[in-house]
Regions:
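Acidic, small-residue rich beta-repeat scaffolds with periodic aromatic anchors
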Residues: 13, 25-153, 232-269
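Long amphipathic alpha-helical scaffold segments
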Residues: 136-189
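A residue-identity detector for tryptophan
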Residues: 1, 13, 71, 102, ...
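N-terminal amphipathic/basic-hydrophobic helices that include classical n-h-c signal peptides
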Residues: 1-26
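Extended rod-forming repeat segments used as scaffolds/tethers
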Residues: 10, 19-21, 88, 177, ...
Length: 269
């Protein structure tokens, strides 16, 4: 690639690697139910050329090294932050049967390098403009609004391409606005005698908090279980089942290990 080529080039190594494992790709009866905001790699041509010269790398090798050294962590941080809104959209959105789409990725970019809507193994990707400099200066609430705005803009483009009514996603956005952009929900509850025990999830930009909520006739108590990174991959496996055994109520993970426990006699006092 010559130096005269001025537009930003994008790289999505993780996505390609992940999707290459989907050997049984089908083009019919897919359910669209997953959404993601991404910060795709923007090539720094000077850095790439310096890597080529200093480490005797090919152009592609230098780009991959530059991505891993200078971009991968930034991208991961943005994806994790944006999960606060994208996971809320996924939770409220009713899956739609499509011909060939199960996920939509909206790439947030300073400059549109690819105006087309791309489809790779059922994952549709579209780019939207995003002001990262402004985003960093905003309050958490305003950051959530900007993230949701970018997601909505990209989803509407793909929905129109797939002839999906945009009202389906607009209704979800309205619900999020009514909830003041707070991504909180009850995962599971269990009633023991007259007391209701539940697990509450609070998904913020920088973390996910899991709580016990204990509701009795005359009082309600919340206890923090633990905080996790803001991605389903980090906290999702902790939520498997609530099990009462003896004098304890256990939160068990998917390996049947104890995440947290409550002593029922103590609660009853």
């Amino acid at each position: 690639m010559g130096k005269s080529e001025g537009r930003a080039q994008t790289l999505d190594l993780d996505l390609r690697l992940n999707l290459s494992t989907r050997k049984n790709y089908e083009t019919t009866n897919m359910k669209l139910q997953y959404f993601e905001l991404d910060k795709p790699y923007v090539e720094n041509q000077q850095r790439v050329e310096e890597l080529m010269d200093s480490a005797a790398l090919t152009y592609e090798e230098a780009r991959i090294k530059d991505y891993r050294q200078n971009w991968k962590d930034l991208r991961r941080a943005f994806v994790y932050e944006s999960k606060c809104m994208t996971s809320m959209v996924e939770r409220l959105f009713k899956p739609v049967v499509t011909k060939d789409c199960w996920k939509i990725i909206v790439e947030c970019v300073d400059t549109i390098s690819n105006p087309s809507i791309m489809n790779l193994l059922g994952v549709y990707t579209v780019q939207v403009l995003f002001d990262f400099s402004s985003y960093k200066t905003l309050s958490p609430l305003e950051q959530k609004k900007l993230l949701l705005e970018a997601l909505l803009k990209g989803l509407k483009r793909v929905f129109k391409e797939l002839s999906i009514p945009c009202s389906l996603i607009e209704d979800v956005v309205n619900e999020i606005e009514k909830n003041d952009y707070e991504n909180s929900w009850e995962w599971k509850r269990k009633k023991i005698q007259s007391t209701i025990f539940s697990i509450q999830v609070e998904h913020q930009l920088d973390k996910v908090d899991l709580f016990w909520k204990i509701e009795q006739k005359d009082k309600s108590i919340r206890q923090l279980i633990q905080s996790y990174p803001a991605h389903e991959m980090d906290y999702g496996a902790k939520l498997c089942k609530l099990e009462a055994k003896g004098n304890f109520l256990y939160l068990l993970d998917k390996e049947n290990e104890v995440v947290s426990k409550l002593e029922l006699e103590t609660i009853a006092e």
